[in-house]
Amino acid sequence: MSNVLDLVDQTFFRLEQAAGVGQCVWVYNRPVDIDGLRRFHQHLQHGRLARRIERSALPFGRHRWVAPRDQRELEIATPRPREEFDAWLGEQANIRLDAEHGPGWHLATLPFTDGGAGVSFVVTHCLTDGVGGCLALVEAACGYDHTINLPAAGSRPRWRALREDARQTARDIPGIRRALVAAAAAARSARRHHGSASNPAPAPIAGADELVTLPAAAFFLDADEWDARAQSLGGTSNTLLAGLAARLAQRVGRVGVDGSVALAIPVNERTADDTRANAVTMVDITVDPAPATTDLREIRAATKRALIRHREVPDERQTLLPLIPLVPQRMIKRMVGVATGGATNVVVSSNIGAAPPAVNRPDGTDADHVALLSRYPDLTKTMTRQLGGLMVVHSACVERQVFVSILAYQPGRLTSNDELQQHVSRVLSDFSLTATMGWPCSEPVGGGAVGDPTI
C-alpha cells in the first residue's frame, strides 16, 4: 500500500493553519473513569491516526505518511467549575497541533468542581475528516488497534527519496497536463464573464494581522422530534440541517445579492481500508432560505439534483489538484477557501448521520452528551475578509440524541458567542424545535416566541 499523500490531503497540509481542527467533546454528569480513558488513549496511539507527514525531498514533490516517533500523554486538567467548560474547550482547540512534527491530536479531560467531567479530543484536519475521526474514536472505544504499516520518519536515504519522489512526479505528469488545460479554460471563462475588470482586492489591514476568535455553539435535540419535524416539512435529516443553516445564514447576512444562500454539503467517499485523511468531496447548492421553515421540498430537490450532477460531472476543483505540489506557498494562502467549502460566502452543512453508539464511550461507558465541532484557531482577520466570514454547521445522531454544532463569524454582524446563541434560539423557534443549549443542558431553547418562558 502506497504511503504517498492523496492530493486533497497535500492541499490541506499546505494550507497550514487554514486547514483547521476537529474537536470531539463529551460531557459526563459523573466522574470519568480515568483508567478507561487511558485505555482509550492507548488505542488511539495505535490506531489510524498514529501517523505523521514527511515532506518530499523535492520542492514540488508529493509528501508521504510516516510513523510517529513519539506521542503525547493523556492530559488530566486541574478541576474547574462546569461554567468554565467552554473556555477550557477553546484552550484545547488552541493547542498547537502539527501533522509534520507532532502531535497531530490531543486527548484531555477536565473534572468539574461541581460534579461530572468533560473530555476533549482535538485533531488536525491534515490527519482526518469527520467520518475518519469518528471511525478512529469508535475503534479506540472498542479496543481495536488499527495498525498502519508505515516507514519511520527519515528512514529513506536522501538519494533514494529523490529517486522515488521523482518517479512519483513523473507518474503525476498526465494529471498535471490535464490540470493545466483545465486551469487555462477556467481563466478564459472568468475573463469572458467578468471582462477586463477585476474585483478590487480587499484593503490591507493596518499593522500586524490579528487572530480572530470565532463564535461557537452546540445544542441537543431529541432524535424523534428532529425526524418528525423533518418529515412534516417534506424533508430529511440532511435537508432539515441544511434549512437550519440557510436560515441562520440569512439572519446574519451571509447571503448572495439575491438573498440566496450557497450551501456546501460534504459527501463521504471513504471506502474500506481507505488511508486518505480527507475522503470527502463537496456538493454545492444554492437555496432560498425564506420557505425553509414551512417547506423543505425545494432544498431536498436541489440536493438530489446536485448529487446526481456530482456523480455524472467531474468536479473542476478535483481536476486542478495535481497542480497543488507545484504552486508556490505564497499563492497557496490565496486558496484558503478549499478548506472551508471552496467559495466565498459559502455555508458548510455537514451531517454525519447515525453514528455508532461506541463513539459516545471514551472511558468505556456512555457519556451524557457528545458533539463534534469545527475549529479554526489560527484564522486571521485577513483570512476572514478573504472568505467574507465563516459558517460551518455539523450534526450527527448518537443513541437517539441529535447534536448540532455551529462555528460562525460574520464581520460586523456576528462576532460573539452571545450573538450566535441569540440567532440560534430564534432560528430554532422559526422551525418549532425545542433544543437544549450548551453543555450544562439545563435550559431548553426554541419552540416558542422569543421571550416565552417555555423557550
Per-segment meaning from a language model:
Residues 15-21, 113, 275-278, 397-400:
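Short, flexible turn/loop "capping" segments at secondary-structure junctions
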Residues 282-285, 392-397:
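Short beta-strand elements
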Residues 21, 388-390:
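Short beta-strand-initiation
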Residues 1-31:
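Short, Lys/Arg-rich amphipathic segments at extreme N-termini
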Residues 2, 26-46, 54-387, 412-418, ...:
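Soluble acyl-CoA-dependent acyltransferase catalytic core bearing the H(X)4D motif
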Residues 445-455:
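Long, low-complexity, intrinsically disordered segments
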Residues 408-410:
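Short beta-strand segments enriched in hydrophobic/aromatic residues
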